[in-house]
């Protein structure tokens, strides 16, 4: 695994559902655009067919990220294989074997989100086979943060950042 240093913060705008949202994102020029895929509990969820259409309008300079919550592996693989997605972000209870199987199937990055409440949660996140880890307070999209004081305990650990 390679440590990558960046001089700028990476931006991902997430939860887009409409063509007009995509056109606005193209103007804003974030690094990544996240789509919540086939998760009916979210009002921001899109179907596989909808994301295929939306990505057609996305600027090629913006990488599409599929955000999945306990999705069937076949859905994630299909969207990555066909080139709809540049990477997958897993936000459910996907275990190590799920992540390992997905990584064996694709060379595209896999991000795993972890809810951080304790130092043990941090330790578990750092053991993940995912290409990158995302540290979160729990359910995404709330704007709430976790206790960032847990991070300094791991300063000697190789930090992985999302590739461009």
What do these predicted regions represent?
Residues 1-164:
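Conserved N-terminal beta1-alpha1 strand-loop-helix module at the mouth
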């Amino acid at each position: 695994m390679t440590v990558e240093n960046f001089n700028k913060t990476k931006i991902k705008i997430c939860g887009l559902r409409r063509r007009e949202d995509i056109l606005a994102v193209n103007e804003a020029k974030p690094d990544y655009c996240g789509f919540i895929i086939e998760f009916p509990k979210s009002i921001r969820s899109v179907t596989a067919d909808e994301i295929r259409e939306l990505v057609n309008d996305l600027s090629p300079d913006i990488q599409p990220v599929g955000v999945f919550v306990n999705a069937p592996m076949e859905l994630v693989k299909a969207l990555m294989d066909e080139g709809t997605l540049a990477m997958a972000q897993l936000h459910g209870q996907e275990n190590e074997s799920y992540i390992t199987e997905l990584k064996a199937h694709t060379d595209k990055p896999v991000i795993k989100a972890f809810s951080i409440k304790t130092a043990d949660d941090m330790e578990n996140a750092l053991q993940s086979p995912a290409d990158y880890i995302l540290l979160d307070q729990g359910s995404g999209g709330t704007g709430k943060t976790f206790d960032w004081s847990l991070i300094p305990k791991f300063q000697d650990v190789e930090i992985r950042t999302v590739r461009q």
